[in-house]
Amino acid sequence: MDRDSVIIFDTTLRDGEQSAGAGLTVDEKLIIAKQLESLGVDVIEAGFAVSSTGDFNAVSLIAESVKNCKVASLARVVEKDIDKAAQALEKATDPRIHTFVSSSAIHMEHQMRKDPEEIIEMAVKAVTRAKKYVDDVEFSPMDATRTDMDFLITLLEETISAGATTINIPDTVGYSVSKEFGESIKLIINKVKNLSLIHI
């Protein structure tokens, strides 16, 4: 896919299900996935395979049933998450593993209890492990809009070097307004040395 093309990444079946009262059965998720496929969505994030048997089964069924777009499973930067995502995606025509780790100072200190070097190491290991299973690996630095920009650039460069093919810049807590977010994306495009090889 052309690097300059716009890719539609739909996370209704994963992030959307976190909305109050939005629980879906496996069959309902498949119906939605088939509709998304018919609409021409490029990537369907089908679920978080390690989180529950239901999510694993949904990702597996969607991976087997959807043929005209990529199917992704979310995974933390943890070996068991990566392995479970890969297992759920085994029958996918075009599988993607989407791995993420907290990157803001507040999340690193209070949620992860890790320093920046440890976060980079965890992210690189996760991307490297995911690449053993699939060609297409997406990486997200969670809470990116509150992350120190120099650290964010280093983290992105390291994960791209490890094999990430798509970089997602999430505004996890709704911290950034549109203009600020746009400026951050411009800065990332201008500063990340190896960004030209991947999608953002």
How would you describe each model-predicted region?
Residues 1-78:
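N-terminal capping/small domains of soluble enzymes
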Residues 198-200:
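Conserved small/polar residues in nucleotide/adenosyl-binding loops
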Residues 24-39, 64, 79-137, 144-194:
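Alpha/beta enzyme core
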Residues 15, 46-48, 141-143, 169-172:
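Short glycine-centered, acidic/aromatic-flanked micro-motifs in structured strand/loop junctions
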